[in-house]
Structure formats: structure tokens, C-alpha cells
Amino acid sequence: MKNINWSGYEWLTQERWGQYHPSKDFCYYDPKAVSIDENQKLTLKTHFNPKTFKGKKINVGVGLISCVEKFSYGYFEIEAKLPKGKNLWPAFWMWSFESWPPEVDIFEGYT
């Protein structure tokens, strides 16, 4: 697991339970698909990088960040180049740290 520091907070580059989500078995969360440049611009990518999880080969690694810390306010901006292909799920979500509802969808698409 790779943690990053960005915008004054600590972020995971995978979900809290790990790199692989059994109900989303078409991709896994890959720390190599997350980068921050010298201007603090965050880039999340999707790339072909096969790995095996619990005996199942998954070909696509995706970038994801999830904040370790709780915060209440902030400014978020997205500029997106959406991927083409089958079984892709580009999204920009804000998740609740401890309460319901679990997420706010800023943008979500599924192919």
C-alpha cells in the first residue's frame, strides 16, 4: 500500500480493505496509476498492468485516492479525459467518513 500526502492530508491509493474489490472484478486499485506533479496536480490513470487476486487475473489497474483523515470543507475541481472501452467506471465521488449517505456523486459514468 502506498500513502501519499496531498493538499495537507494523507491519502490511501487504494480502498481501506485493499487493492481488490470482489464485486468490481474488472479492475484493481494500483498505486502506480496515481501521481502528483511539482505543481501539486493529481493525476489518476487507467492502464493495462495484469495482476492476480485470489486466483483471478485482473488486467486493468486504476488510480484511486481515499483520504485517511476527516475534513469538512474544501474546493475540488476535475478536468477529465474519459476512457473508452468496456467495463470502465470513471467517477468523482466524495464519501462520508462515518455516516449516511455514504457518497455524493460529482460525476459518474459506466460503460
Residue ranges and their predicted role:
Residues 1-111:
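GH16 jelly-roll
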